[in-house]
From Swiss-Prot:
It is found in: Cell membrane. It comes from the Archaea. Pfam families: VIT1. InterPro entries: Ccc1_fam (IPR008217), CHP00267 (IPR006682). This is Uncharacterized protein MJ0645. CDD domains: CCC1_like_1 (cd02437). The chain crosses the membrane at residues 24-44, 51-71, 114-134, 139-159, 167-187. GO terms for molecular function: iron ion transmembrane transporter activity; manganese ion transmembrane transporter activity. It is a multi-pass membrane protein. The keyword Transmembrane applies. One of its GO terms (cellular component) is plasma membrane. It comes from Methanocaldococcus jannaschii (strain ATCC 43067 / DSM 2661 / JAL-1 / JCM 10045 / NBRC 100440). Keywords: Cell membrane, Membrane, Transmembrane, Transmembrane helix. Its main location: membrane.
Length: 191
């Protein structure tokens, strides 16, 4: 029988857990919408390589930023909770850092940060793909379609998890994508 290393099990459990799912969804939304904004903003260029570089560069920067942001925010929250527990237990500062629970929480925090950043990077790469395959105008419309599809699927998923109407949840996400597209087209046309 195949044995899965304990650290890999921890990663899989985090991905399948509530935190992992939340960061995957958040990252995909963040990445796809920000990349859509970048490709629309850069679409005035006659050179697809400029749009591709801007989209991928922005996506990678956004992904790395989300790794750092998620890890920093989660760790700060974890530390605040640890300090409060130590005070209520009348223990000295740092006492709980040696606990298995604390070490597991730190590991999950790091995994969630990575999940967020990787999901953001993947989400941002998807709207850029059409610029490898089509002329700029066609690629732009395909990128918008891809982003709308991603967000509709995520909306349906969110609706299913939250026991809401999945179609309405999907439509709400599509409305967000359309709002981003319209605003970014307005900005692109202004310059």
């Amino acid at each position: 029988m195949l044995r899965i290393p304990r650290s890999l099990k921890s990663i899989i459990n985090t991905i399948n857990g509530e935190s992992g799912t939340r960061y995957i969804v958040r990252g995909l939304i963040d990445g796809s919408l920000s990349a859509l904004g970048v490709v629309i903003g850069a679409s005035g260029s006659a050179d697809a390589s400029v749009i591709i570089a801007a989209g991928l560069g922005g996506g990678i920067a956004n992904g790395l930023s989300n790794i750092l942001g998620a890890f920093t925010a989660e760790k700060a929250s974890l530390e605040r909770e640890r300090i409060q527990k130590e005070k209520s237990l009348l223990k000295k500062n740092g006492y709980l850092k040696k606990s298995i629970i604390y070490k597991k929480a730190i590991r999950e925090t790091m995994i969630c940060g990575l999940i967020d950043g990787i999901s953001t990077t993947i989400g941002s790469a998807l709207p850029v793909v059409p610029f490898f395959l089509f002329d700029i105008k066609t690629a732009l419309y395909v990128a918008i379609g891809i982003t709308i599809a991603i967000l509709f699927i995520l909306g349906v998923f969110i609706g299913k998890i939250s026991k809401e109407n999945v179609i309405i949840s999907g439509i709400k996400m599509v409305a967000g994508a359309l709002a981003v597209a319209i605003l970014c087209f307005m900005i692109e046309k202004a310059f």
